[in-house]
Amino acid sequence: MTIRFVSVVGSDTGLLDAAIAHYRGLGVEFFHVIRHIESFDDPEFERAQDVLMRYGLAFAAVHQGPWDEDLNAYLIRAQMRRHPSDWWVVADLDEFHVYGRPLTDIITACEVGGYDYVMGALLDRVAADGTLPRLNPATSIWAQYALAGLVTLRVVRAVTSKVTLARGDVHLHLGQHGALTGRSLPATEAFAQVHHFKWTDSVLPRLTQRVQAYSSGDWHLTYPATIVGSRRMLKYLEANGGRIDVTAAKLALRRCGSDYADYEPWTDLVPTLLKLRSYAAAADQPGRPAPTRSVAG
């Protein structure tokens, strides 16, 4: 079996080094990292190239142009369809998958059972004091963001289900929240934790930019839930002094390392997360697969 990784990287590349190391540790052989830039003057472009070079890698493609909600799906689909029989780990740069058993065992279970993809759900990582600290490359991200819990589900109230692993010929919903083709491996076999390292110092300016760009019309708004969730999170942070309230019971924040068993409430949460899975495709996405237009690179 061949295991590939695909992700689209924008201007916020602080997690790139940690992501490559993490997924290599899971057994990924080939990395298809796509760089999206609006201008080649992007100061992070060379830094991201340098990170890849340290691992003997290069960008699979560089796409220059304005961002829109469908872009990541276009770029990811263009890579996956080149190797339709291989297995692809699909993740945003701030998403670190954790499984309860080796990836090769999970893929074998899929191939033996005739399954085409694996599901999981977001588990947000938060600093112990609830602040939004800057990434420190000298310290493990698991230690910097030592708590795990349900910020996206309970505050943003966004869809948290994710396709984490899929054959290259599977058609994914935008955002990888589900799939329109293929069969899902039962959650009893594998249900991935998607550790979500979003809550850093860059999140506030990114959320603010998103709301402003959508409100002004600079970005075309296809999915209204996107801006609603961003506004909700900004309002929450303002009300809490720029922090996440780590004492709030509804967020279920717990000390958590990098092992699947570290987050104690997970087993009890999975049934609830599975109930939300069908909602992901029906409500968060308008029932369409990732587009398949041609993308150079």
Identify the function of each model-found stretch.
Residues 29-30, 86, 116:
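Short acidic/polar active-site loop segments enriched in Thr and Asp
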Residues 1-24:
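N-proximal low-complexity "stem/linker" segments adjacent to membrane-targeting elements
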Residues 9, 34-37:
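Short beta-strand/turn micro-motifs composed of small residues
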Residues 2-3, 24-35, 57-58:
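Short loop->beta transition adjacent to catalytic acidic/histidine clusters or analogous donor-positioning motifs
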Residues 72-74, 99-297:
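Catalytic-site signature of metal-activated, phosphate-bearing donor transferases
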Residues 36-91, 98:
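Active-site-proximal specificity loops/subdomain of glycosyltransferases
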